[in-house]
């Protein structure tokens, strides 16, 4: 349907340009419009993940909501900001004056460049590999020029500047995102009560976002809106005025409403999270309670307490986290051992057998059924949730809502630990038999299902029951309780940091529920800002060669001074939106979830700083890569949160893809250009 519309559009365009001096090459113009639409489709399927990937990954918006918002802002951004970068792509990379007497070669080169870029981006989207659309079109443009005119046809000085920008853009974006997140964490996230400072900062955040966005639109000089006639001082005055007005609106209307909403959420959920069950028990000082295991066996899992003696305080708050993931079944009551409440000064070895009281007075209970398993089978059983599974998304979303200390769970819950090698969260599900991990009805079980190894095996073996909606399971031999404790300590990274609450913060640096509410709207706004900037910058990747093709056909002048037509930018924006709806979810999953866990606060920092970098580059006509900016910001903020929170293996793969994209798209474009030059023309 979309391609039929593209064909009808090209027919209409061809009819209006029928009086041009190159009427014999009308077929090339029509072919160029079709390929340009495919290229725009591929840009939407791959590059749009940069804009809303983090918002979807943090759970702030759904995929459908992201597609709707991106469709609006990508299109508007392509119309208002895209013209200037299109000029750089059209004239900045090659010397178009060399084609004065061979206009048909320039037209063929434009078609070749679009084809080479589109093919490689479609392949990359199929492989869920985020690449740079700017890299593609630059490499393809150089490829056809080398075939058409040799090395003299390329402006190598401009190419060097562009290559430098590919490395400078992630560095600058990363620095800006890191500074912003550092300030947010220092003045908001790390406060005992983050709400007051967060509400005070809201007007500033909104004002900066709106002011920068408006300045970008007006400074670019969108002819459609008459902004090209505004002087610089007028642009600055209008932008600052609108930013101040927005700040006042937020301060007097949005902040009070947000404060009331947060208060309602806290009142309706005393535990500060819908996942938590908070129990307030009044107990007298110096009172000691001793319960035997036989007495506990008849109690519910939530009230299970071991035989340890604990001095109880006047008011003790016990918080537990309950996760319900997929079709998981709780272990039978008889397979669970009771939790034990221990003193705050206890070692990690003792903590593995009971519960720990955090410095803030909260009593966190640990799930404990390992001893029972070891006594019966001599094995320690654990299951890993794969980062690409459906459960990982649900688990990650719930981790964002739960506070750090509460994520350890109670006697019926699953303690969480970090698996660095896969960059995924791990559930140590104690007391749960392997056969409780059953594939859902209709799930694929083909070659992805490997031979099962049951807990009574003598040697260490890995079990894989893994597709995108199932689990990675593992079974390890552990012959003594001390060995088990050492392995768990090493896996959690606690080491000798006994009783350290900062180690928990390092692993579970998640937003508090009220902070999540505070930053949700901001992340949506900054994501829209990023989508707007992306539309302005990356629509040129699809439309730049088409603009050259159309203007050469229409005027016969390779160095035409005619401004980029607005309807051509709109044409590219529509293609980008369709690509997003049809195929965008593949790369969104890679960018938004796999590189590093995203929270609303970190997502806001990533979006605002990277979008600011892209918009500035668009305004000075420098074709940078939005992929590089976003990856640089994600890695920078993830590294600040925890060095082990970043999937460095995935980052390495993305970094390698930055280098292979230019030559691959260039080779494809050069091959098509050779066919045009030596066979067709």
From Swiss-Prot:
GO biological process entries: biomineral tissue development; cell population proliferation; phosphate ion transmembrane transport
Subcellular compartments: Cell membrane
Residue list for modification Phosphoserine: 269, 273
Segments of skewed composition (Basic and acidic residues): 275-290
Keywords assigned: Cell membrane, Membrane, Phosphate transport, Phosphoprotein, Receptor, Symport, Transmembrane, Transmembrane helix, Transport
Membrane topology label: Multi-pass membrane protein
Domain of life: Eukaryota
UniProt keyword annotation of Membrane present: yes
A, as annotated region: 554-562
An MF annotation (GO) of this entry: phosphate transmembrane transporter activity
Transmembrane portions of the chain: 25-45, 66-86, 106-126, 162-182, 207-227, 234-254, 515-535, 562-582, 604-624, 654-674
InterPro entries: Phos_transporter
GO cellular component, one term: plasma membrane
Renumbered residue ranges of the record's region Disordered: 269-296
Pfam families: PHO4
Catalytic function, reaction form: 2 Na(+)(out) + phosphate(out) = 2 Na(+)(in) + phosphate(in)
Stated family: Belongs to the inorganic phosphate transporter (PiT) (TC 2.A.20) family.
Note: Ectopic expression of feline SLC20A1 in guinea pig cells which are not permissive to Feline leukemia virus subgroup B (FeLV-B) confers susceptibility to FeLV-B infection.
Free-text function comment from the UniProt entry: Sodium-phosphate symporter which preferentially transports the monovalent form of phosphate with a stoichiometry of two sodium ions per phosphate ion. May play a role in extracellular matrix and cartilage calcification as well as in vascular calcification. Essential for cell proliferation but this function is independent of its phosphate transporter activity.
PANTHER family registered for this protein in UniProt: PHOSPHATE TRANSPORTER, SODIUM-DEPENDENT PHOSPHATE TRANSPORTER 1
Annotated protein name in UniProt: Sodium-dependent phosphate transporter 1
Organism: Felis catus (Cat)
